[in-house]
Curated annotation (Swiss-Prot):
Zinc or magnesium. Keywords: ATP-binding, Cytoplasm, Flavoprotein, FMN, Kinase, Magnesium, Metal-binding, Nucleotide-binding, Transferase, Zinc. Catalyzes the phosphorylation of riboflavin (vitamin B2) to form flavin-mononucleotide (FMN), hence rate-limiting enzyme in the synthesis of FAD. Essential for TNF-induced reactive oxygen species (ROS) production. Through its interaction with both TNFRSF1A and CYBA, physically and functionally couples TNFRSF1A to NADPH oxidase. TNF-activation of RFK may enhance the incorporation of FAD in NADPH oxidase, a critical step for the assembly and activation of NADPH oxidase. Transmembrane segments: none annotated. It comes from Mus musculus (Mouse). The keyword Lyase does not apply. This is Riboflavin kinase.
Length: 155
């Protein structure tokens, strides 16, 4: 994908509530206008990168972009799992994301357990990839230092 790394930010909105409740893997969801403005060559699938909430620390993350076939979503979504434990929810805060690599396409699963297992595998692979020097340097990108109040797509 020519668009990677891809930088975007937007206000965290409520999703379906499945990430925490059903999967044990909480996600922060972008509003529709952020998803609708993704570059055409950013295909659906699972990606990895860096994320921060507001002006907070930058953490590793995985993000699902698409329709989540297991749940048969009718609207395209962008759901970010930040690999960090937060003390409380952060709905309404600005989420800053740098997508740096692609893991796999979206696919359906025959059970909730196999979906959870795949996501856990994605998280482990993302951790490894983000430790590589070419990805690690993006953690300190100026994108995470600029004014956090501006909602934008692109860099």
């Amino acid at each position: 994908m020519r668009s990677l790394p891809f930088f975007c930010r937007g206000q965290v909105v409520r999703g379906f509530g499945r990430g925490s409740k059903q999967l044990g893997i909480p996600t922060a969801n972008f509003p529709e206008q952020v998803v609708d403005n993704l570059p055409a060559d950013v295909s659906t699938g699972i990606y990895y990168g860096w994320a921060s909430v507001g002006s907070g620390d930058v953490h590793k993350m995985v993000v699902s972009i698409g329709w989540n076939p297991y749940y048969k979503n009718v609207k395209k979504s962008m759901e970010t799992h930040i690999i960090h434990t937060f003390k409380e929810d952060f709905y309404g805060e600005i989420l800053n994301v740098a997508i740096v690599g692609y893991l796999r396409p979206e696919k359906n699963f025959d059970s909730l357990e196999s979906l959870i297992s795949a996501i856990q595998g994605d998280i482990e692979e993302a951790k490894k990839q983000l430790d590589l020097p070419e990805h690690l340097k993006l953690k300190d990108d100026n994108f995470f230092q600029v004014s956090k109040g501006k909602i934008m797509n692109g860099h």
